[in-house]
Amino acid sequence: MAEPVNNLIDLLLNDNIKGLKPYESARRLFSGAGNKQQVWLNANESPFANDFTIDAERFNRYPDCQPPAVIDAYAAYAGVQPEQLLVSRGADEGIELLIRAFCTPGKDSVLICPPTYGMYAISAETCDVGIERAGLNDDFSLNVDAIKAFKGKVNLVFICSPNNPTGTSVDKNQLLEVVEHFADSAIVVIDEAYIEFDKDNSWAAELTHYPNIAILRTLSKAFALAGLRCGFTLAQAPVIQALMKVIAPYPIPEPVAQIAAQALSSEGLVTLEQQVAVINQEKALLKSALAEIADVELVGDDKANFILFRTPQKSALMSHLVASGILIRDQSKQINLDNCLRITVGSPEQNKQLLSEISRFFTLQTSTQEA
């Protein structure tokens, strides 16, 4: 029966899905590694695992679509009004909701600025929405003129700041020029997943002035809750109301809402600040150590919780680290990132282990060359 079933699936499968490949998330790339791989530094997760309490009293009831405790707490944290906020299953769902709400399949397009986060393109492809590209400049700043040339051709402009994987923040004047240029034709989506590591560059305070911006946020990075899948879209009320038309009826499970509210409490925010400080300190130590290695070139900036670097020994180093139980992310397939690897800042112990293995690798390479 396998062949008839496969033929049926091929017959019924959505045409724009047929040529797609599943997104290679950091977790999927090493699926099945389990406990064999102890040091996960490939997904920009936090090294901290915080404790929370769960009340099961309401587990027999469907949850609120937009849990008030979470909405109110995050609105206060971000400095916006509750009606300017939508909570979703990670910022990734926010990306998909924006595309579904503001792009007509088979007709409209979005603009991305590579090298950047891959889910903008993946979500557009799965929704049968076109993808235009305006690559970043060599210094990873926005190519504003290239972006502006797409006015009237795209409905959404995705800009990641701080940018994954380059760690660079977008100049506010450049971003303002883009926002104003598309004021009557497109929504500019500013992905601030890493904004806790670059707080002074948030656009949240500008929401009231610019109706064509939407901001993506998450609890997955600095808040150390990647496993929770809880993200936010910040925008003026008409944008939020449009997203509410396409979001699922019960997107936020009750346990997720409870934990998110605790993470956003006054005590939770103190923990956040303390842990961000530790990560920033460890990031500086990692950068300093990597900069001393002859075959390593630091790339981009450090406005997030990761470090990007280039080495001609990229493949061999990656293989060595995997064999040593340390997983980092290969970014060399992205434009202008040849031979680049990305390291998530881990715990002090993880970072020491990483640096030890990197040092051992280059020592072995030198010994081999001398022999």
Curated annotation (Swiss-Prot):
InterPro entries: Aminotrans_II_pyridoxalP_BS, Aminotransferase_I/II_large, HisP_aminotrans, PyrdxlP-dep_Trfase, PyrdxlP-dep_Trfase_major, PyrdxlP-dep_Trfase_small. It comes from the Bacteria. The keyword Hydrolase does not apply. It catalyses: L-histidinol phosphate + 2-oxoglutarate = 3-(imidazol-4-yl)-2-oxopropyl phosphate + L-glutamate. Keywords: Amino-acid biosynthesis, Aminotransferase, Histidine biosynthesis, Pyridoxal phosphate, Transferase. CDD domains: AAT_like. One of its GO terms (molecular function) is histidinol-phosphate transaminase activity. Its EC number is 2.6.1.9. Pathway: Amino-acid biosynthesis; L-histidine biosynthesis; L-histidine from 5-phospho-alpha-D-ribose 1-diphosphate: step 7/9. PROSITE patterns: AA_TRANSFER_CLASS_2. The modification N6-(pyridoxal phosphate)lysine is found at K221. Its cofactor is pyridoxal 5'-phosphate. GO terms for biological process: L-histidine biosynthetic process. Homodimer. Belongs to the class-II pyridoxal-phosphate-dependent aminotransferase family. Histidinol-phosphate aminotransferase subfamily. HAMAP family: HisC_aminotrans_2. This is Histidinol-phosphate aminotransferase. It comes from Pseudoalteromonas atlantica (strain T6c / ATCC BAA-1087).
